[in-house]
Every structure is written in structure tokens, then in C-alpha cells.
A protein has these predicted regions:
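Non-catalytic, conserved peripheral segments adjacent to functional cores
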Residues: 1-105
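Conserved metal-binding segment of the jelly-roll/cupin
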Residues: 101-119
Length: 119
């Protein structure tokens, strides 16, 4: 599923990074957005779900996980998520990806183990 994602600044996805465009269904009651299903190509297995917030002007990063794959979705507002690949065995070592995601660009961003990320 590796492909170029049509977003400004992202010309070559970091190896193992996947992007799923999310469909938002609004109506008079609010919005519905399905994020991840067990039959999605991106679904691996269930581990945990957590929610984080960031105050305006605050940056959370740089960090990575040795074994964990992250699935990021921004449900309110907009966030810039930056990825950096320093994995020695990766074909995209040294590559940086930037994603602007949230209510105006609803995507799920899958980040593989050992890829640095911050937002």
C-alpha cells in the first residue's frame, strides 16, 4: 500500500508509513467518522487506544517506539505531524514527511516502529 500521498510537501512516503483518507459524514446531529476497521488493509492487531491533546504553540516530540505501530487521527482542530526516518536498514533513511491533518484534512496516519514523530 506504499504510495505517494497527494499532500503539499509529501513527495515520497517514508517506508512503512501508510495514509488512509477518512470519510466524514455530517448531519444535523453532528459528524460521524469511521477511523479503523478489523477488515482494513492497515489493521494489524489491537493493542491500546489513547487520546492526547496539545495546547497551542506546544510541540510534542521527538520520540519513536521500538516495536509499537501508531495510528494517528486528529479529531478536533488541525495538527502538523512530522516524521523522520533514521532507520539504518530503510530505503528512505534521512527522509522527512510533514502532514497537516484534522478536520480540514481527515486522515489516519500509520507510523511504523522506529520512525521518529512529533506534533
Amino acid at each position: 500500500m506504499r504510495r505517494e500521498f497527494p499532500q503539499k510537501g509529501v513527495t515520497n512516503l517514508i517506508e512503512g508509513v501508510k495514509v488512509k483518507e477518512l470519510k466524514v459524514i455530517p448531519d444535523e446531529r453532528g459528524r460521524l467518522m469511521e477511523m479503523l476497521r478489523a477488515d482494513d488493509d492497515l489493521f494489524m492487531r489491537f493493542g491500546q487506544i489513547y487520546m492526547t491533546t496539545a495546547y497551542p504553540g506546544v510541540i510534542k516530540g521527538w520520540h519513536y517506539h521500538k516495536k509499537q505501530t501508531d495510528n494517528f487521527v486528529v479529531v478536533k482542530g488541525m495538527m502538523k505531524v512530522v516524521l523522520y526516518d533514521e532507520r539504518e536498514s530503510s530505503s528512505t533513511r534521512g527522509e522527512v514527511n510533514e502532514f497537516f491533518m484534522g478536520v480540514h484534512n481527515p486522515i489516519l496516519l500509520q507510523i511504523p516502529p522506529r520512525v521518529h514523530h512529533g506534533f
